[in-house]
Amino acid sequence: MNYAYLNLDNIFLSLDELRSIIHGSEKEYYYGVALYEGDERVAYKSGAIKKTGKALAISTDVKDVVEALRGRCYSVDIDVPMREYKNYAKTVYGEVVSSIKTSKKCEKLDLIVTEGVIIAGERKAEKHTESILSHSKRPYSQSGTLNPEIGRIMVNLSESQREVYDPFVGTGTILIESRWLGLRCIGSDIDPVMITKSLANLRHFNYECEVFQADARNSPVRKVEALVTDPPYGRSFSPKGLKELYREFFYQATELVDGKLVFTTDFKFDWRDDLKSAGFKGVKIHTIYEHKSLSRAIYVVTK
């Protein structure tokens, strides 16, 4: 059994990203922690999961945990996602540390105390924050640009295993994250300036993607595994013009995508009825607060 320590600021989004990466569901869930079967290094490729590893002991009794770990050598970290267990966690930490050898040279041991349960596990992976930070430092960016962390989450939510197409490519966030994840990346934009900027950003990281100028409502792409994108929703469109753009794009998307459509928009818009009218059936929405003037909604849509 493996464990995933989730982002407490958006637990449901983290949990959904985990399910998408493992193409399945968690076996058990405690506040802030999911227990699952599959790849124990899931956190490395995630945008919202803090760390993952192999569970060694799961119990409400600290004695069980101590017996499972006794005599081993670890560098110990403790997490207490629920405040009411902080004092109990100190006791757990003390008993565990006194029964093992501790050294920073040894493997990381995560002790997580939540809902009265103690989860002890060997950490196998952490979120790759270095690449996320690196991808934020690119030649071209602009106001409202999707940040790499959200872009990575979106690509993972698509469950794509081969390719991703972004028909509103902008400065290339989705393509950059798709390529980092090892996927074939295709992008287009109606604005030639955005094509130039996205290509420059891709070259900056030595990433190769197929990028071309096209209207998202009439794309030359015929079929793609997953459609992941950040359509416009700013002041450049009137409310009527924006609604028409999205409606036409949704109808085009039903023809293009074999798997999932994942897109972001301002949370104040509700596109569920328009998506269903276009032929999509399943709609899941996650909200992410960014700053006082913008909260994004991530739509995960299936046919």
What is each stretch, according to the model?
Residues A68-I118:
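A short N-terminal interaction module
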Residues M1-D64, T102-K108, V113-K303:
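Class I S-adenosyl-L-methionine-dependent methyltransferase catalytic core
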